[in-house]
């Protein structure tokens, strides 16, 4: 994929060896079938990753922890994993995608969670603030109605993500 000259993203090949003034990335393999978080970074900031269900397309959720505060990025997922709900437990901020409406069917549900499921994950996890992101045309058609579904199932603060928005994270 990143091979110089032949890869679909060949222009990014410098990330593999640090050439072209790009930061060298060190790939970390995470088994898509693991049900326990994998530590990606440890130090003043800790980052853990967990595979999340997104049809046949691999996806990872991330938990970033600084002191007592944490932000969990749900990533693209269909919301069917109790392991993820545990992973997101007591997050200061939970960022979840809202790309499909409540009435979505078929393939969309293999990839994405309905608004009601987004709400139940946030509520069960005890998230402090829920940030809704990754809107698609089908969820934007009636964004207010989709957010209302989330509000019915989640009592905490809800933020509609927008580019360059700043969200205060407290512990």
Residue locations for each model-derived region?
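Cap/insert and terminal regions of metallo-dependent hydrolase folds
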Residues: 61, 70, 77-166
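Fold-independent oxyanion-binding glycine-rich loops
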Residues: 30, 50, 75-77, 97-98
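Binuclear metal-dependent hydrolase catalytic cores
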Residues: 1-71, 145-171
């Amino acid at each position: 994929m990143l091979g110089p000259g032949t890869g679909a993203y060949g222009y990014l090949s410098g990330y593999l060896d640090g050439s072209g003034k790009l930061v060298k990335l060190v790939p970390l393999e995470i088994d898509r079938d693991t049900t326990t978080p994998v530590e990606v970074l440890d130090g003043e900031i800790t980052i853990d990753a967990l595979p999340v269900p997104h049809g046949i397309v691999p996806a990872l959720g991330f938990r970033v922890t600084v002191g007592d505060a944490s932000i969990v990025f749900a990533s693209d997922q269909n919301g069917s994993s109790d392991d993820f709900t545990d992973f997101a437990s007591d997050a200061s901020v939970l960022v979840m995608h809202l790309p499909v409406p409540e009435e979505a069917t078929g393939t969309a549900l293999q990839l994405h969670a309905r608004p009601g499921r987004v709400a139940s994950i946030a509520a069960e996890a005890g998230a402090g603030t829920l940030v809704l992101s990754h809107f698609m045309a089908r969820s934007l058609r009636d964004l207010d109605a989709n957010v209302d579904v989330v509000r019915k199932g989640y009592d905490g603060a809800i933020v509609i993500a927008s580019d360059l928005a700043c969200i205060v994270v407290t512990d």
